[in-house]
């Protein structure tokens, strides 16, 4: 899908207090994996709360193309899986649209099959580096035909029998870790991933839930050793997907910034590898109350009550980056309204997201009167409490859903309106965003609609 065909600009204006109660769509990471593991497992998997954004649906289509049967009955997705080791060679290239997670995880899943699988994506995904996933697959015996710089379109030609490897992940990347573990599912023997910096652990938790022989040990230096025994049986499960913390970030920050707001957000995933933003905002003085913390499907879930707050600038520890990598754009918005300076460092991963997210955020802040400094791996924001003088700019989103939503949040609290050049790609991760924000009282209008 090309989002650039017909861009739809949107403008956010200074809003009165945001109030109400919302339930956030399902977590994107868990939704991708639910379709993948359900499609791979033997028997039936039932999923409620699935995020029905384009990215996740593309992962579902890929699993269908390899033999899984997927249908929706009411609010429940029902999957009849093929059984581990039994995926079929797809007849056409698998099209992942804008979905980096879906593409990279599926490369791991299918790479070790003795078959030929081609991957394509939209203009944004075709610019993103895939080598980080392809290199360990090459070590396992997979042949790769790729565009320059290990980019898509690309084709994987699997070995007759894959070699199990022990792979030390060179950067903090849950996608690389997951791709290697999934490749290990169809590989004889034990595949090991060595992870020096812990990243989101949904793959490990969910594979264990589906019955994989997977163990995790942390050594005395805090390095995780994750071992999976290949060619075991996976069995279908019932999954209720908790609300996505990365999507939660947008209404949450909006409620903190718009004067007089009080918003309750239900059913939010509180996995400790994903809560860096909430922790950082609390350090800045945010009034975020965590209500009814509970376990659902092996994951921590809670409700959040958020009240408008006066924020202070902080230095965010760089080691926190993996637990909030997708939330830095909206944290930069919060920092724009905080008293003093906020320093964010260790942001090199942001350079290879849907856009060069670090540059996109810095340019957007500058266009709206925010005093900020972009370093090679850092961003420093000097805030203006109350948003006085902020806004009035148009932000280039570069087909990036999180840039679009972050700057629309900014416009709700800034003195002057903020416009984003395109809002169509918000549908990749949070199709309900516009309606949900309007329901809380946010003034956001798409061009041509008032």
From Swiss-Prot:
* EC number(s) reported in the record: 2.5.1.19
InterPro entries noted in UniProt: Enolpyruvate_Tfrase_dom, Enolpyruvate_Tfrase_sf, EPSP_synthase, EPSP_synthase_CS, RNA3'P_cycl/enolpyr_Trfase_a/b
Metabolic or biological pathway, per its Swiss-Prot or TrEMBL entry:
Metabolic intermediate biosynthesis; chorismate biosynthesis; chorismate from D-erythrose 4-phosphate and phosphoenolpyruvate: step 6/7
Q: Per the record, what is one GO cellular component?
A: cytoplasm
Where it mainly occurs, coarsely classed, is: cytoplasm
Q: What does this protein do?
A: Catalyzes the transfer of the enolpyruvyl moiety of phosphoenolpyruvate (PEP) to the 5-hydroxyl of shikimate-3-phosphate (S3P) to produce enolpyruvyl shikimate-3-phosphate and inorganic phosphate.
Instruction: Name the chain's protein.
Output: 3-phosphoshikimate 1-carboxyvinyltransferase
Organism name: Brucella abortus (strain 2308)
């Amino acid at each position: 899908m090309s989002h650039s065909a017909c861009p739809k600009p949107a403008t956010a204006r200074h809003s009165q207090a945001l109030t109400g109660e919302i339930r956030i769509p399902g977590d994107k990471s868990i939704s991708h994996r639910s379709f993948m593991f359900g499609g791979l497992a033997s028997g039936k998997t039932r999923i409620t709360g699935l995020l029905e954004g384009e990215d996740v649906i593309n992962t579902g289509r890929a699993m269908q193309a390899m033999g899984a049967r997927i249908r929706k009955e009411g609010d429940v997705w029902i999957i009849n899986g093929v059984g581990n080791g039994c995926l079929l060679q797809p007849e056409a290239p698998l099209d992942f649209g804008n979905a980096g997670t879906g593409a990279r995880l599926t490369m791991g899943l299918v790479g070790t099959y003795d078959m030929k699988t081609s991957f394509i994506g939209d203009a944004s995904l075709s610019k993103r580096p895939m080598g980080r996933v392809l290199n360990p697959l090459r070590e396992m015996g997979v042949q790769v035909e790729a565009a320059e710089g290990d980019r898509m379109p690309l084709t994987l030609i699997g070995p007759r029998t894959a070699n199990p490897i022990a792979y030390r992940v060179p950067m903090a990347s849950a996608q690389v870790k997951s791709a290697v573990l999934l490749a290990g599912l169809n590989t004889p023997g034990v595949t090991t991933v060595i992870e020096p910096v812990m990243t989101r652990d949904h793959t490990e938790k969910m594979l264990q839930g589906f019955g994989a022989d997977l163990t995790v040990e942390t050594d005395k230096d805090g390095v995780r050793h994750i071992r999976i025994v290949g060619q075991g049986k996976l069995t279908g499960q019932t999954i209720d997907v908790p609300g996505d913390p990365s999507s939660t970030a947008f209404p949450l920050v909006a409620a903190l910034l718009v004067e007089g707001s009080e918003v309750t957000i239900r059913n939010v995933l509180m996995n400790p590898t994903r809560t860096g933003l909430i922790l950082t905002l609390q350090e800045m003085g945010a009034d975020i109350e965590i209500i009814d913390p509970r376990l659902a499907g092996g994951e921590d879930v809670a409700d959040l009550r958020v009240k408008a707050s006066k924020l202070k600038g902080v230095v965010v520890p760089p080691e926190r980056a993996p637990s909030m990598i997708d939330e830095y754009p909206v944290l930069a918005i919060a920092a724009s309204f905080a008293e003093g300076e906020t320093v964010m460092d260790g942001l090199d991963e942001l350079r290879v997201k849907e856009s060069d997210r670090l540059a996109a955020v810095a340019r957007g802040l500058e266009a709206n009167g925010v005093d900020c400094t972009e370093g090679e791996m850092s961003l420093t924001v000097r805030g203006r409490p109350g948003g006085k003088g902020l806004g009035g700019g148009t932000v280039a989103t570069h087909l990036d859903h999180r840039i679009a939503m972050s700057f629309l949040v900014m416009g709700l609290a800034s003195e002057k309106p903020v416009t984003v050049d395109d809002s169509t790609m918000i549908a990749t991760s949070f199709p309900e965003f516009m309606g949900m924000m309007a329901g809380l009282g946010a003034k956001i209008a798409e061009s041509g609609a008032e």
